[in-house]
Amino acid sequence: MSDYKEILSQEIAQLRAKLEQAQVPEEFAYQLKKEIVALERSVELGSYDEKYEKTSRYLDWAVNVPFGKKTEDTLDIQKAKKVFDEHHYGMTEVKNRFLEYLAVLNLQKQNFSEEDFSAPILLLVGLVGTGKTTFAYSLAEALGRKIVRIPIGGMGSAKELRGDSRLKLGSEPGKVLKGVVESGVMNPVILLDEIDRAADDANMDIMGVLVEL
């Protein structure tokens, strides 16, 4: 039993070390530290139960969120045009529309502070196989950003986007947060692919979650 307690204590120490190294917002870090103290207390008292599993899993995800880590945007219109032309033949109207988009981002960056700077949502519409997904990857490359692809087609539950309650054993975050964690930055391009192909019985719930996000 003492060996088991030692293993748990080492796991908690690793979580604490990760929290110290992570650039977590102050208020959130305070809450996470309270959770860690509660875990340490439960191990000391020998009261390991489901709560330990739930809390440690939550903390492990929380400390891996890349708070404060971003990629610098490359808003070079000539570079973007070169990237688009390398990956897609024709599509002149679409390319020009995206170049206009980059020009607007350039103006925003010059005239607004980083806090007020925002990139509008882009909607790619077209028949199957016309290059919507690959164009999104080209846009991410042109911007110098990482990309996270979330396939909505066939998704049967909004929980896949939002995630489960942390109180549920074996719970995990939704695909959006998972994608951000896996990308290692807070500002990846998030591609919601085949958004029109969500399962009929879950379509409204999924759209509701997207509006909320």
Language-model region placement:
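Conserved catalytic/switch belt of AAA+ P-loop NTPases
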Residues: 192-213
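Active-site phosphate-binding and catalytic loops of NTP-dependent enzymes
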Residues: 69-70, 105-114, 146, 174-175
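Glycine/charge-rich, flexible interdomain linkers and switch-proximal surface loops
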Residues: 74-77, 81, 102-130
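Conserved alpha-helical scaffold flanking the Walker A/P-loop in AAA+ ATPase domains
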Residues: 167-191
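Conserved P-loop NTPase mechanochemical-coupling segment
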Residues: 146-166
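Extended, charged alpha-helical coiled-coil/arm scaffolds that mediate oligomerization and mechanical coupling
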Residues: 1-107
